Structure formats: C-alpha cells, structure tokens
C-alpha cells in the first residue's frame, strides 16, 4: 500500500478527532512527564495532548512520511518520529501511551499492547481506541465488490475476510494481570455526512486504501463506481438528504 494521504484523512478532521477527545477525557493523569501519541497521523490527536499538558514532553510516532510532514507543520515545537510500533520501545519516563485508531492495523496487537503496558512505570496509562466496524456495510461492501469484479485476483488478499476485533473480555484477560485498573467500553458514533458520496470519501482515507491502491486507474474508477452504488443502497437518506454513518469503536484505558 502506498503512503497514507494526510489531505484525504483530514477531510473529516472533526469527526475523526472526536474519538481522540473521548479517549483523552478518560485518562486520569494530571502531570505526565512524557506522553507518546502512537500512530499520530497528521497531528490532530497530538495537538489534544499538547493542549491538555503543555508542560509535558509530547512525542508523536507514525510510519507515514506524509502524515508526519503534516504533523510537523501543525506542531513545529513537538517531536515526531517515523517508527513502526511493532518494533518500537517506549522511552524512559513515559507516563502515557495514547493510541487512536492504529492498533487495528497491527498484527497480534493484543501481544503488542501487553508489551507496551509492561514497559510503563507504575501509575502509567495505556489509552487505546480502535474502530470496530468490519461488519458495517461500509466495510462489507468493500469485500463484496472486491469478490465480484475483474480485479478479483488482484484484490484477493484485501478481500479476504478480516478478523473482527477480539471480544472485550480478551482485552481484559490480556491486560488486567499487568495493571491495577482497566476500563473497556464501546461507543457507537452516528456521523452526520452530506450524502453517500461523503461516506466513500471517508473510507478512501483509511479502510478503502488496500482495495483501491493496487488497481490501475481505469479499474479503480470502476471499483469506486460499483462500491458507491452499493453504499447508496445500504445507507438511506435522512429527511433532509443527509446520511448517518454508523461507526462503532472500542476503547481501552489501563492504569499500571
């Protein structure tokens, strides 16, 4: 997959940042020495950390050069590092690991969360949010279109049914032995979008990438045409012509 596009991602900045705000509201730290925003993207979530704890050392890490470029432009006084969290080790004196919408992309992420929580000092916090929407029409339709067109072989890996997130109890059992307190909850957002085309624009910034990036321009256009038609059928218009994008998310806050 090509590099992430910060411009595409930020088309829905307010909606994408809201889960970060909701996650941050449950972090019970008054004065962390160091906080790391894992999967910082274009810096919208990092900015929330800076605003809440202006005296703390705030670090953002991401694998995307384009996302990091935008983050550095947005917050020139902060430190941003290109790193893969699967191989990354938290620096000393880190009191908060904050991860908004990143670990759903990380293989064996339960094991990674255990490793990272174990690296925190006593009282440190691991705060994680992940989309839990693979069974939503927005994602089911991606796989259906991938299976139904001339791109079937090209998209075989992308179209393979992905594992949904583990049940909440799996996170509890994995993390509770490593911490003194843990909170786990789901929130279902109903984002008000202009029309069904806006849903397509939303997922083009994230979940649709593995499906459209491997295609040639002509095939990509046809894939998006078919996907858009199916999305229009799956998401009825409201009385004012807008649509509601149902978006479940899982939250975990563990205090070591």
UniProtKB/Swiss-Prot annotation:
Catalytic activity: trans-aconitate + S-adenosyl-L-methionine = (E)-3-(methoxycarbonyl)pent-2-enedioate + S-adenosyl-L-homocysteine
Keywords, in A-Z order: Cytoplasm, Methyltransferase, S-adenosyl-L-methionine, Transferase
Main EC class the enzyme belongs to: transferase
EC numbers, comma separated: 2.1.1.144
Coiled-coil intervals: none
Cellular location(s): Cytoplasm
Keyword Cytoplasm among UniProt keywords: yes
Cited CDD domains: AdoMet_MTases (cd02440)
Keyword S-adenosyl-L-methionine: yes
Gene Ontology BP term (one): methylation
GO cellular component terms, semicolon-separated: cytoplasm
Domain of life assignment: Bacteria
InterPro entries, per database record: Methyltransf_25, SAM-dependent_MTases_sf, Trans-aconitate_MeTrfase, Trans_acon_MeTrfase_C
Gene Ontology MF, one: trans-aconitate 2-methyltransferase activity
NCBIfam families xref list: PRK01683.1 (NF002463)
Free-text function comment from the UniProt entry: Catalyzes the S-adenosylmethionine monomethyl esterification of trans-aconitate.
Homology family: Belongs to the methyltransferase superfamily. Tam family.
Protein name per Swiss-Prot or TrEMBL: Trans-aconitate 2-methyltransferase
Native organism: Nitrobacter hamburgensis (strain DSM 10229 / NCIMB 13809 / X14)
Lineage, highest ranks first: Bacteria, Pseudomonadati, Pseudomonadota, Alphaproteobacteria, Hyphomicrobiales
């Amino acid at each position: 997959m090509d590099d992430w596009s910060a411009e595409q991602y930020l088309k829905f900045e307010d909606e994408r940042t809201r889960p970060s705000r909701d996650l941050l509201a449950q972090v019970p730290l008054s004065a962390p020495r160091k906080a790391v925003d894992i999967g910082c993207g274009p810096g919208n979530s990092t900015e929330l950390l800076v605003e809440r704890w202006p005296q703390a050392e705030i670090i953002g890490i991401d694998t995307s050069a384009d996302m990091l470029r935008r983050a550095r432009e947005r917050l020139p006084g902060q430190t941003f590092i290109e790193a893969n969290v699967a191989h990354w080790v938290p620096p000393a004196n880190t009191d908060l690991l904050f991860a908004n919408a990143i670990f759903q992309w990380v293989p064996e992420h339960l094991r990674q969360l255990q490793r990272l929580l174990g690296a925190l000092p006593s009282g440190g916090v691991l705060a994680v949010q992940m989309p839990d929407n693979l069974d939503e029409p927005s994602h089911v339709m991606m796989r259906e279109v991938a299976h139904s067109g001339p791109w079937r072989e090209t998209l075989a890996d992308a179209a393979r049914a992905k594992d949904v997130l583990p049940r909440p109890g799996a996170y509890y059992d994995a993390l509770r032995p490593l911490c003194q307190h843990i909170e786990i909850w789901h929130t279902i957002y109903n984002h008000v979008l202009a029309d069904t085309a806006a849903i397509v624009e939303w997922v083009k910034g994230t979940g649709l990438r593995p499906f459209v990036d491997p295609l040639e321009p002509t095939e990509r256009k046809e894939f998006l045409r078919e996907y858009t038609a199916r999305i229009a059928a799956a998401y009825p218009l409201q009385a004012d012509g807008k649509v509601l994008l149902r978006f479940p998310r899982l939250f975990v806050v563990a205090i070591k």
